[in-house]
Amino acid sequence: MSAAAAVTSWTNGCWSPAATRVNDGGKDDVWVAVDEADVSGARGSDGGGRPPLFQTYKVKGSILHPYRFLILARLIAIVAFFAWRIRHKNRDGAWLWTMSMVGDVWFGFSWVLNQLPKQSPIKRVPDIAALADRHSGDLPGVDVFVTTVDPVDEPILYTVNTILSILAADYPVDRYACYLSDDGGTLVHYEAMVEVAKFAELWVPFCRKHCVEPRSPENYFAMKTQAYKGGVPGELMSDHRRVRREYEEFKVRIDSLSSTIRQRSDVYNAKHAGENATWMADGTHWPGTWFEPADNHQRGKHAGIVQVLLNHPSCKPRLGLAASAENPVDFSGVDVRLPMLVYISREKRPGYNHQKKAGAMNVMLRVSALLSNAPFVINFDGDHYVNNSQAFRAPMCFMLDGRGRGGENTAFVQFPQRFDDVDPTDRYANHNRVFFDGTMLSLNGLQGPSYLGTGTMFRRVALYGVEPPRWGAAASQIKAMDIANKFGSSTSFVGTMLDGANQERSITPLAVLDESVAGDLAALTACAYEDGTSWGRDVGWVYNIATEDVVTGFRMHRQGWRSVYASVEPAAFRGTAPINLTERLYQILRWSGGSLEMFFSHSNALLAGRRLHPLQRVAYLNMSTYPIVTVFIFFYNLFPVMWLISEQYYIQRPFGEYLLYLVAVIAMIHVIGMFEVKWAGITLLDWCRNEQFYMIGSTGVYPTAVLYMALKLVTGKGIYFRLTSKQTAASSGDKFADLYTVRWVPLLIPTIVIMVVNVAAVGVAVGKAAAWGPLTEPGWLAVLGMVFNVWILVLLYPFALGVMGQWGKRPAVLFVAMAMAVAAVAAMYVAFGAPYQAELSGVAASLGKVAAASLTGPSG
């Protein structure tokens, strides 16, 4: 079907490009449709057939077959290389040979783990127009979960924009609800949500009237121009000015919330002698944490809170008012209903492990079951927003398409993470396109991608630990469970579970939130509710691991569920990423440490049952062991120290053949990488940044994670990973100020040492070539060694810019400094090292002659 014949989708009078039926896979130079006959047959049946809700594409054979051949060829080359090395064992430096051999074997093993799951990349494209044809009036309910903790580390402006973008999403307003979990229990977050509920009465109808994209006001107003898709272009300018003015006032109120609450509390405390409480606007104590900590009102010790800020709307549209003095924006033809909005802060008590984000998600899962009980759940981090207003419709294409296409067996749909405000060169590989568009896309050909923590739609019953329908109906499985021991003692919550198993149902809110419901909600948010249950193990998000997202997805895959990796244009969701070097390193430290925790736990992929696809098992094994190989990379990067303490060294003899093997296997992996760049649709810059940041992590962060894990195994104590802090551009006035800020931490030291060693090794190599001549054996060996050193320094180039701080804006300074350092080391070697090495060589030769004479004895 050509683009000219695309079917138009109108929702609230809006044209959405995401809703066109794209069927041009055959025209793509990389991807080809695999279900073309199915699609064409359904659409050519005079309306009797129903087209599928998504289309599937595979990589063309002209790319896939050479790609697979190269993988096989490199595997053969690696085996031949190992066999050759064993036959030519270096006995002069046995310890070095043994160490490098073990490292190379692990390199080969980890490469196989990484490469095998990539053999059949599949792309699945949702057809939102087909969804509208088949489910125009019966889309199922969705509960949207948003998590946040600290309004400082996670700026509150991000959170309010996330909530506003969700409230304005293009989905039936009476069929989804939004829940915010504030794990800090702060009044600032609660009153920010009160402000959001008020501003949404203006923002959401404005979005519907003019079909604006994106629907996060901060990002929308930051855009310079965009195509107009609404139906009243003549009113856009005046409405835009009015709404923007209101938004700026809204931001002022949000920014001043902390001081406003403090001033109010000071006034109330002055009236109540001896009190130092934090007061709400209605003159009552805030039940959460106070500015001045007190008993039952501090971090880690406060009551649970559930507040419905926006009630569930009616099923019938409610049109707004015409323009007037009180209502300057004309919403007379616009549905002004708002989705349900709920604020949650779970109870915290000393002596309980609250399990961070996973614990908060499980509380929201229980509370939402009582208040809305939608059969599908989407979760967001507090700094991710809805970038494509139809983002909630896209995953439904995969969840609702049965027809033998696996929809009913799909546990979750994962969208790639896309980021704003990353520096143009993506210095620290924040976009991570190689992982999202390469690795995750390739898993679509197996059981599906892993769960990545945000931008994910779940089937509620899959979170409850129910197995996929191929092993029995969900309702039957739930009835057969030991419900009290598995899910807890709340009969109200248990009563919602069978309804949650019906994927076709909409939201059915409680008629009245009376005292009995309030009591149930308090019980569900209590610390003790999960005692003696399966929450955090077989039910909900998994506990006691830093990467609870990956392990939660793994639990579903091992039960036989499938997942889907879906990408739409424009991107469904966008968020923020840490552009500061230290924060980025701490982020990947948490990820790598959590991966190792997964390997050394009952969630090890080797322990999964037969329902886990063999190559999916390999993929999870790779995800949980990748930091281990970096220990060998770290020591390889320190090998240049040998240039500083000896005249020459050999890892393997004969060196010439060793070098040929090495060049061959390295060249092949880069050619394979180019094929992946092609089918993943990424740029060479993306690939290069991925290579560079992998080396940066391998020289400090990943070995540190291995050390942490070793200490945990020895001592039995858990690992604490700090929350990645994010800063708004407005806080400093410079969009990329964090990029040039140096935060010195011990985590930087190993990589700095590696850089110093390799710069010194380059200097020694230059000195050797100058002292002995580039054509002599010491000279040309020095030049070859220098190639390795320079390659390491090129990979560590982004790190070097990061530790330079403001000087990183002038890369020329780095090159000049390195050139001067190399020249200084080379000069010192020529002046002191070369004569010393010559003297040692002379002494060694003399000793050799004496030894030979003593062995042969006197002649005659």
Swiss-Prot record:
Its EC number is 2.4.1.-. GO terms for molecular function: cellulose synthase (UDP-forming) activity. Disulfide bonds: none annotated. One of its GO terms (biological process) is cellulose biosynthetic process. Residues 235-263 form a coiled coil. It is found in: Golgi apparatus membrane. It is an enzyme of class 2 (transferase). InterPro entries: Cellulose_synth, Nucleotide-diphossugar_trans. The active site is at residues 183, 549. One of its GO terms (cellular component) is plasma membrane. Its main location: Golgi. It is a multi-pass membrane protein. The chain crosses the membrane at residues 63-83, 93-113, 625-645, 655-675, 693-713, 747-767, 781-801, 812-832. Substrate binds at residues 381, 383. Keywords: Cell wall biogenesis/degradation, Coiled coil, Glycosyltransferase, Golgi apparatus, Membrane, Transferase, Transmembrane, Transmembrane helix. Belongs to the glycosyltransferase 2 family. Plant cellulose synthase-like F subfamily. May catalyze both beta-1,3 and beta-1,4 glycosidic linkage on beta-D-glucan. Essential for (1,3;1,4)-beta-D-glucans synthesis in grasses and cereals (Poaceae). The mixed-linked glucans (which are not present in walls of dicotyledons or most other monocotyledonous plants) are particularly important constituents of the walls of the starchy endosperm and aleurone cells of cereal grains such as oats, wheat, rice and barley. They can account for up to 70% by weight of the wall. This is Putative mixed-linked glucan synthase 1. It comes from Oryza sativa subsp. japonica. The gene is CSFL1.
